[in-house]
């Protein structure tokens, strides 16, 4: 990016039918007015894993280091970065304060890795409200679940 003030906006969401159950994730990337939608499916997963997967895949879609505003309705995802949970988990060898292992370590570690090249603002949005792109992500993630359930009854 030539102009360091240019920001990529990434909206993410995950959905799960049952928890655990079949799940979908989606991300919408917006840069200079151009919108890219990506989404995917996992057979047996949880809503939190899908929220993390959406952020991972959104960041993996970037072709070079960027300034990013990443929007999610997942407190689990946003608070891990904004409240310093992730640093504490790393310092404590991926154990929570109650000494139990952090869930979804594989995805947290992958998310940290794909985050490294970027400057990211982690922004919480209200789910199922009037945020156009959060609602679009929710729809795309849910469509992934419906599509796979229909194809594999």
From Swiss-Prot:
Endonuclease that specifically degrades the RNA of RNA-DNA hybrids. Signal peptide: none annotated. Residues 4-146 form the RNase H type-1 domain. HAMAP family: RNase_H (MF_00042). Belongs to the RNase H family. Mg(2+) 2 binds at residues 13, 138. Disulfide bonds: none annotated. It catalyses: Endonucleolytic cleavage to 5'-phosphomonoester. It comes from the Bacteria. It is found in: Cytoplasm. The keyword Hydrolase applies. Keywords: Cytoplasm, Endonuclease, Hydrolase, Magnesium, Metal-binding, Nuclease. This is Ribonuclease H. GO terms for cellular component: cytoplasm. The gene is rnhA. Binds 1 Mg(2+) ion per subunit. May bind a second metal ion at a regulatory site, or after substrate binding. Monomer. It comes from Caldanaerobacter subterraneus subsp. tengcongensis (strain DSM 15242 / JCM 11007 / NBRC 100824 / MB4).
């Amino acid at each position: 990016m030539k102009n360091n003030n240019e920001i990529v906006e990434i909206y993410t969401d995950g959905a799960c039918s049952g928890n655990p159950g079949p799940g979908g994730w989606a991300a919408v990337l917006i840069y200079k007015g151009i919108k890219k939608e990506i989404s995917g499916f996992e057979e047996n997963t949880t809503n939190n894993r899908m929220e993390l997967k959406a952020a991972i895949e959104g960041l993996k879609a970037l072709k070079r280091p960027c300034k990013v505003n990443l929007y999610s309705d997942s407190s689990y995802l946003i608070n891990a970065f904004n409240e310093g949970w992730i640093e504490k988990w790393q310092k404590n060898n991926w154990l929570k304060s109650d000494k139990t292992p952090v869930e979804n370590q594989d995805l947290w570690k992958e998310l940290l890795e794909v985050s490294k090249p970027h400057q990211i603002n982690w922004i919480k949005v209200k789910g199922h409200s009037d945020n156009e792109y959060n609602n679009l992500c929710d729809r795309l993630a849910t469509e992934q679940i419906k599509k796979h359930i229909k194809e594999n009854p």
